[in-house]
Amino acid sequence: MNSKPEKKDIDIYDFDHTIVPFDSGTMFFVYCMIHYPWCILLLPFIGFAFILMLVGIFHFTQFKRVCYTYILFIPKEKAVKKFWDKFEKYVEPWFGERKRYSVVISASPDFFLEEIAKRLNLDKLIATRHNPKTGIIIGENCRGEEKVKRLFEEFDESEINVVDVYSDSLKYDKYIFALANGKCFHIVKGERQEFNYSDIYKEG
């Protein structure tokens, strides 16, 4: 009689305001505006796109597509490396204590997080897909329910056991918290605060 293969135990982490205490995509945007000041010429277009989002003409993913057009005008690989040379030190110390296969799922750009993922020896990175040359978003922004969808594109649901989940956002990461068979950790100012899923997300 064949026994079922043992499931892989994994922990899931958000990235921004979880592993680092800031929104890395926004920080990189500001960094590029300072170090590559010609990108400032794009700000009126980005501001207009922001207004269109506020009035409901653009959705958030469309707004992000406009924001990342600045990638066309910078030395992307050099900028990303120099950014993380400066900001890697802000990674939360407790992240180095991880004990099992770690999956980071983030709405930040894949081309931007791949560098820090290598430096931190992450097991798996799932992030918003971008065209590596143009910076344009490919598909959907990796946030909310999209995180779960992307997880199961990478792993067969029957082959993994989600143990612990870490995120700063109780609102947007409800869906990945629901996967936890171990513990849920709400990250508040860098501190891990354990909570019971059923206490926070009451039915009805």
Name the predicted role of every residue range.
Residues 42-68, 117-120, 124-125:
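Short, compositionally biased "basic patch" segments
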Residues 2-55:
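Active-site neighborhood of HAD-like aspartate-dependent phosphohydrolases
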Residues 61-91:
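Metal-dependent phosphoesterase signature
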Residues 16, 55, 68-71, 83, ...:
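A general boundary/transition motif marking the beginning of the first structured unit of a protein
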Residues 21-22, 60, 144:
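Generic structural signal for well-ordered secondary structure
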Residues 27-28, 46, 62, 66, ...:
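Exposed alpha-helical structural elements
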Residues 2-10, 80-204:
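C-terminal cap/substrate-recognition subdomain and adjoining C-terminal extension
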